Amino acid sequence: MRFCVSPNFYACPTDSINPVIPFIGCDTAMSQKIPTQDNSPNPVKIHQPDHDAIAKGRKIQSRSISGFFSKIRLSSMTFVILLYSLLPWVNWEGRQALLFDLSHQQFFIFGWTFAPQDFFFLSWLLMIAAFALFVVTVFAGRVFCGYICPQSTWTKIFMWIEHLTEGERNARIKLDKAPFSGEKLIRKSIKHFLWFVVAFATGFIFVGYFSPIRNLAPEFFTGTLGGWGYFFIGLFTVFTYMNAGWLREQVCFIMCPYGRFQSVMFDKDTLIVSYDSERGEPRGKRKKDVDLKDAGLGSCIDCQLCVQVCPTGIDIRDGLQFQCIQCALCI
């Protein structure tokens, strides 16, 4: 058997073992490409998220919606508001049921009384609460953020007032873009006045957890409260007004560490709100009776409704994001 040297291979036989197959020059045969067929699926155009949208400081105008998860969220937030507002007024054995009396260095929690030397038990209580929060996050995701977090709850109140005074989402956007007018001044003034009333009530009740609230009300309006009392009521009034009225979701994005912790507490079994890209992509408008397979479209019609109802202004279709508070309004 004779061999010839090929520039692409070490050697190839020039004598055919099978006499039926004619000899083809080694260099010529090896230089010809074997015909192939591309059987890969058609590429899917994936929507790329706008990561700079939050950094641009755009104002989020969410749309009102009703549904199963919306009703659950409203019920849980109503419970939180009522619990916060009414608990200081409850008496237990002739005194305020829940009172953190700093002046006398005593904490009253219903039938228990804690002195400074008992702070060890309060520390355990706080650690148990934190551990319970982490356990809930591992199994159910950020349901705390979406349903009972005070920041989300008070933001919901302020957004409801905004909807009441300025209208639905499109009307609010139109009002913000409109030039200054008497109607705009009246609507904005009423909104901020109601915001201030809610913020003041929140600050007043909060101070009532540290000073007997039944004495706090007459002392405040008669001017006998004292400088520190007025200071802290004013401080928490401004704090609530700014957080729920202006900062809103920015508190969750920047100031709250819990949103950052979620990435290390999630696993493959954690319940989260997510978008099924295999079913929804490629997204796009379509006619009513169009065949999705023939049109090369997924189930998502790209109506933007899931984005408009989101209180944090994210697009759930962009994948898992730390800004998502798992309120499930997009479902």
Task: Enumerate the language-model features and the residues they cover.
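N-terminal cationic leader/targeting segments used for protein routing and processing
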Residues: 9-11, 19, 34
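Membrane-embedded alpha-helical bundles of multi-pass integral membrane proteins
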Residues: 31-284, 307, 328-331
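Short, flexible, mixed-charge glycine/proline-rich loop motifs
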Residues: 136-139, 242-248, 291-294, 298-302, ...
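Membrane-embedded translocation segments of transport machinery
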Residues: 278-296
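Generic short N-terminal amphipathic or hydrophobic helices
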Residues: 16-23
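Serine residues within intrinsically disordered or low-complexity segments
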Residues: 3-6, 16, 31
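Structured cytosolic domains appended to multi-pass membrane proteins
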Residues: 311-331
